[in-house]
Amino acid sequence: MPRDLTSQDSVRQDSVAQDSVHRDRVIAGRYRLAGPLGGGSEANVQKAFDLHSGDAVAVKIFRCSDAANEAPFRREVDIHGRLRHKNIVRVLGSGTTGHQEGGEIRNFLVMELVEGMDLRTLLHHQPASPRETAEWVSGIARALTYIHRRGIVHNDIKPGNILVNLAADPGGPGVAQLTDFGIALTGGTATPGSSSGTPHYLSPEEVRGENSTTASDVYSLGLVALECLTGTKAFPGPPLESMVARTLGEPRIPGTVRRRWSMVLHAMTDPDPAGRPSASQVVGMFRRLSR
């Protein structure tokens, strides 16, 4: 049965409401803003209407155009903008807003509007069922397979960067779609200490300041899968405490998790990157789990 998603607390308006980008404002002469969808430290996301096509879209507006925000924006344009996959939120365009209040000029991305919620919000309501977990995690694993074959490491796999498109799967679990490539890496690996992903989902090697690789994405997805089933972070607590725990052992998998699932989760969160399955192997593992 599809879960009840009538609650509207998925819209995180606290930081967005303070932003100088207002509802009904038209940016770049084309996109009429229609209200906040969410936001983070670097950008806020607004629902908008494309006045040229009439389509509803999502516009990600970066908070300022200084050097600190220019790099994530360029990565989104150069990396995310060229990706085309069912399980990746599609970038439709980009630009600058022109002069804002206070004379600021802001970069923005135009993306497909996903009718649903981010995974963090869904798990706040209740843990996912095994069926939902298998569907969502295998979808993101397919997205990772696609980007890894192109030499891209997402570098920030977490529930907040996974959107569940409910409209694309009426009556079903929904289609999981990966978003936010602001700290993605190209070339397959990064220089040591380069990871700036979310502390609670970093791999042990990233915590130690080692290379971020495709195996690091798989580890983070393993933590997401475990959180789907339990409703709680695998390594809770303050960020530093959580990261230290990562280097001391594997995540604890409750006895309530079925043995077949436990084996897959242990493989994905192997402390040794070389011991983890590839993203394409994860797809096969979850296909077998869902039978």
Please describe what each predicted stretch is:
Residues 94:
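Activation-segment/catalytic-loop signature of the eukaryotic protein kinase fold
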Residues 34-40, 45:
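Protein kinase glycine-rich loop
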Residues 217:
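Conserved catalytic-loop aspartate of Hanks-type protein kinases
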Residues 63-82:
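AlphaC helix of the eukaryotic protein kinase fold
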Residues 136-137:
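Activation segment signature within eukaryotic-like protein kinase domains
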Residues 101-118, 122:
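Conserved short submotifs of the Hanks-type protein kinase catalytic core
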